[in-house]
Regions:
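Acidic/histidine-rich catalytic cores of soluble enzymes
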Residues: 20, 83-180
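Short loop/turn segments at strand-loop or loop-helix junctions that form parts
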Residues: 22-25, 59-63, 168
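Active-site groove signature of glycoside hydrolases
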Residues: 48-71, 96-105
Length: 180
């Protein structure tokens, strides 16, 4: 199929894929939508395994259908829902020999290094790791403490970081704006 065609094409040009992204909302409260999302994650994991991609990456969502920021994103309830919904995806990744890597983002459920560490510890799988993007841990409310936040992330998550994504930011109109 298509996956094997891509695998041959990438091999022909000596290309490797570092991460296959699957940025869907594992905290979607709509049960039917969530079921489809979980199946989509599993399809991405299968596709990654066929392509020889070691990592499927994702962010950590929001407890609403719109995948938008709200204060509830940082609640204990949202974190518990995310962990519960992530668990079967990671179990499938284990079976397929693929790493599932979550990317902490300030506006999402896993918004800081401590919450990321908790997800890793509660799921307890070597197939769950971290995509570390330091700028994603920052917001207008905390960017002036960026050195402390980034150092804490490396200390708390360092052994479980699968990938690092580097970018910069500027403050514009009272908000952080990511720049390449």
């Amino acid at each position: 199929g298509y996956a094997l065609y891509l695998k041959r094409l990438f091999a022909k040009y000596e290309l490797d894929i570092a991460v296959l992204g699957c940025y869907l909302n594992l905290a979607n409260p709509n049960e039917e939508s969530l079921r489809k999302i979980v199946h989509r994650y599993m399809a991405h994991i299968r596709f990654a395994a066929l392509l020889g991609v070691g990592v499927v990456g994702t962010e950590t969502g929001a407890p609403n259908e719109e995948y938008k920021y709200e204060e509830k994103n940082h609640s204990e309830e949202a974190l518990e829902i995310f962990i519960k919904n992530l668990r079967p995806v990671v179990e499938y990744a284990e079976k397929m020999g693929v790493i599932m890597a979550i990317e902490p983002v300030y506006k999402h459920i896993v918004c800081n290094p401590k919450r990321a560490r908790r997800v890793l510890d509660e799921i307890g799988s070597p197939n769950l790791q971290i995509i570390f993007d330091p700028v994603n841990l920052l917001d207008i409310s905390n960017y002036q403490k960026r050195d402390t936040i980034i150092a804490e992330a490396v200390e708390v998550l360092g052994d479980d970081i699968a990938m690092v994504h580097i970018k910069d930011f500027v403050v514009e109109d009272g908000k952080l704006k990511s720049v390449a």
